[in-house]
């Protein structure tokens, strides 16, 4: 049986060193896809942007800078609060988001309870994933 862990977060989109905008976001973790965290960023009334992150990347980013390429994550402070910075890069543009560190850590602890780190392979159905990929081609 698959378990889903989700949470809603209030992120900040960093526009400049003096300015940021609120970005409501949802994180979702499904034990059927144990390596990934799916993020939905609500960028407008009806608009959303979706990204998929490695759970390990977010967990490591709580404590130290990590990631290369399209996604980089690191701990920081903003207005006296612990935040996790998430830098996203794609052909469509770049964004720097700040997530509240405590809320992200709480979410990740709940994912760890669902699938302890290092045991993801026990929850990953390779045959199902290959069937899905082959069906798309």
Swiss-Prot record:
<dbReference type="InterPro" id="IPR038658">
    <property type="entry name" value="SsgB_sf"/>
</dbReference>
<dbReference type="GO" id="GO:1901112">
    <property type="term" value="P:actinorhodin biosynthetic process"/>
</dbReference>
<dbReference type="GO" id="GO:0070590">
    <property type="term" value="P:spore wall biogenesis"/>
</dbReference>
<dbReference type="Pfam" id="PF04686">
    <property type="entry name" value="SsgA"/>
</dbReference>
<keyword id="KW-0717">Septation</keyword>
<comment type="subunit">
    <text>Interacts with SsgA. Interacts with FtsZ (via N-terminus).</text>
</comment>
<dbReference type="GO" id="GO:0090529">
    <property type="term" value="P:cell septum assembly"/>
</dbReference>
<keyword id="KW-0749">Sporulation</keyword>
<dbReference type="GO" id="GO:0030448">
    <property type="term" value="P:hyphal growth"/>
</dbReference>
<comment type="function">
    <text>Involved in sporulation-specific cell division. Required for early stages of sporulation. Important in the process of growth cessation prior to sporulation-specific cell division. Recruits cell division protein FtsZ to the future septum sites and tethers the contractile ring structure (Z ring) to the cytoplasmic membrane during sporulation. Stimulates polymerization and filament length of FtsZ in vitro.</text>
</comment>
<dbReference type="GO" id="GO:0043936">
    <property type="term" value="P:asexual sporulation resulting in formation of a cellular spore"/>
</dbReference>
<dbReference type="GO" id="GO:0043934">
    <property type="term" value="P:sporulation"/>
</dbReference>
<comment type="similarity">
    <text>Belongs to the SsgA family.</text>
</comment>
<dbReference type="GO" id="GO:0030428">
    <property type="term" value="C:cell septum"/>
</dbReference>
<keyword id="KW-0131">Cell cycle</keyword>
<keyword id="KW-0132">Cell division</keyword>
<dbReference type="GO" id="GO:1902075">
    <property type="term" value="P:cellular response to salt"/>
</dbReference>
<dbReference type="GO" id="GO:0031160">
    <property type="term" value="C:spore wall"/>
</dbReference>
<protein>
    <recommendedName>
        <fullName>Sporulation-specific cell division protein SsgB</fullName>
    </recommendedName>
</protein>
<dbReference type="GO" id="GO:1990586">
    <property type="term" value="C:divisome complex"/>
</dbReference>
<dbReference type="GO" id="GO:0000917">
    <property type="term" value="P:division septum assembly"/>
</dbReference>
<dbReference type="GO" id="GO:0042244">
    <property type="term" value="P:spore wall assembly"/>
</dbReference>
<dbReference type="GO" id="GO:0051301">
    <property type="term" value="P:cell division"/>
</dbReference>
<dbReference type="InterPro" id="IPR006776">
    <property type="entry name" value="SsgB"/>
</dbReference>
<dbReference type="GO" id="GO:0051781">
    <property type="term" value="P:positive regulation of cell division"/>
</dbReference>
């Amino acid at each position: 049986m698959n378990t889903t862990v989700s949470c809603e977060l209030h992120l900040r989109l960093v526009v400049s060193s003096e300015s940021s905008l609120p970005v409501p976001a949802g994180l979702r973790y499904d034990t059927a896809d144990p390596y990934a965290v799916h993020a939905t960023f609500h960028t407008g009334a009806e608009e959303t942007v979706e990204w998929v992150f490695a759970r390990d990347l977010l967990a490591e980013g709580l404590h130290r800078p990590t990631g290369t390429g399209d996604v980089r994550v690191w701990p920081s402070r903003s207005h006296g609060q612990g935040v996790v910075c998430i830098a996203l890069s794609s052909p469509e543009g770049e964004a720097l988001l700040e997530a509240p560190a405590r809320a992200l850590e709480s979410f990740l602890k709940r994912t760890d309870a669902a699938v302890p780190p290092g045991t993801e392979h026990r929850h990953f159905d390779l045959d199902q994933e290959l069937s899905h990929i082959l069906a798309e081609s």
